[in-house]
UniProtKB/Swiss-Prot annotation:
Top-level lineage group: Eukaryota
Claim: DNA repair is one of the keywords in the record: no
Localization (cell): Preautophagosomal structure membrane
UniProt-recorded Gene Ontology molecular function terms: Atg8-family ligase activity
Disruption phenotype: Blocks autophagy. Significantly decreases the radial growth of colonies under nutrient-rich conditions. Strongly reduces conidiation and completely fails to form any perithecia.
Protein's name in the database: Autophagy-related protein 5
Gene field: ATG5
Record note on modification: Conjugated to ATG12; which is essential for autophagy. Conjugation with ATG12 involves ATG7 as an E1-like activating enzyme and ATG10 as an E2-like conjugating enzyme.
InterPro entries in the cross-refs: Atg5, ATG5_HBR, Atg5_HR, ATG5_UblA, Atg5_UblA_dom_sf, ATG5_UblB
Family: Belongs to the ATG5 family.
Length: 254
């Protein structure tokens, strides 16, 4: 029986309230899946506002080309999320997504053979499943990536750490800036047991995570919820990674 967690994550929606400087009193109101991307709204927004649209801003921050659920974890906005759209640098979101999938495949296996030997049709279907928010179709293809013939070597993991002042980021997360920690993280410990999240955090960020058991100075959030330190990394990857294959954790300083 499949786990209910992936389906719940694919079903989650983020409500949006989007305005354009030329039409500040006429918002575009919608909701999109947590695993979707703001850039996928651009054709509808350009038509609605009758203006070129390509860049998204929250307060004074131009948002990066990340899954909308990760952006919400980073900036912790009130919902519906009030954004401004304007003309700016365009995003080639499909290529960016597939490059991340290839990178995650390489991290997991030490090579990118699983994704590289896939047909063009399957890689296109993988991206189309994200566009359509079609979890069953996505899972049929992604299961081949996650179940390589060789043992899992590393877990693709990115940890987003606030770099602005602790008082500023705690009180106004929308003003925070972040650095991304990306380190090769083995799926098992030296004793061959599954590596736990707390162990990984202590290895990579010992100053913030002096204990591998409890969140003393900081915690991590994923998909809007705190993550237990005793969760095995491989289980988290299989259950809660973003569609591009990456496990994305946001550090919240306590």
């Amino acid at each position: 029986m499949s786990s209910p967690i992936p389906q719940a994550l694919w079903s989650a929606q983020i409500p949006l309230h989007i305005t354009h400087p030329a039409s500040p009193t006429t918002p575009f109101i919608t909701s999109i899946p947590r695993f979707s991307y703001l850039a996928l709204l651009i054709p509808r927004l350009s038509t609605f506002f009758n203006s070129p649209c390509s860049s998204f801003h929250f307060e004074d921050v131009q948002l990066r080309n990340l899954a909308v659920g990760l952006l919400v974890d980073l900036y912790q906005p009130a919902l519906p999320w009030k954004l401004t759209v304007n003309d700016g640098v365009g995003w080639d979101i499909a290529d960016t997504f597939l490059n991340c999938v290839k990178e995650a495949d390489f991290v997991r296996n030490g090579n990118a053979n699983q994704i590289m030997k896939m047909s063009k049709e399957n890689t296109t279907q993988l991206w189309n499943a994200v566009i359509d928010n079609d979890h069953p179709s996505f899972n049929r293809i992604n299961s081949h990536l996650l179940n390589a013939p060789t043992a899992l070597k590393h877990v693709p993991i990115r940890i987003y750490v606030p770099t602005s002042g602790p008082d500023s980021s705690a009180t106004h997360p929308e003003h925070a800036t972040f650095k991304v920690i990306q380190s090769l993280m083995a799926a098992t410990s030296s004793d061959r047991r599954p590596k736990l999240l707390g162990q990984a955090l202590k290895e990579v960020l010992p100053g913030l995570f002096p204990s591998s058991r409890d969140p003393i100075l900081a915690k991590v959030v994923m998909h809007g919820a705190g993550v237990p330190f005793d969760a095995p990394l491989e289980d988290l990857m299989r259950e809660a990674a973003y569609p591009d294959g990456w496990l994305c954790l946001v550090v919240i300083v306590l």
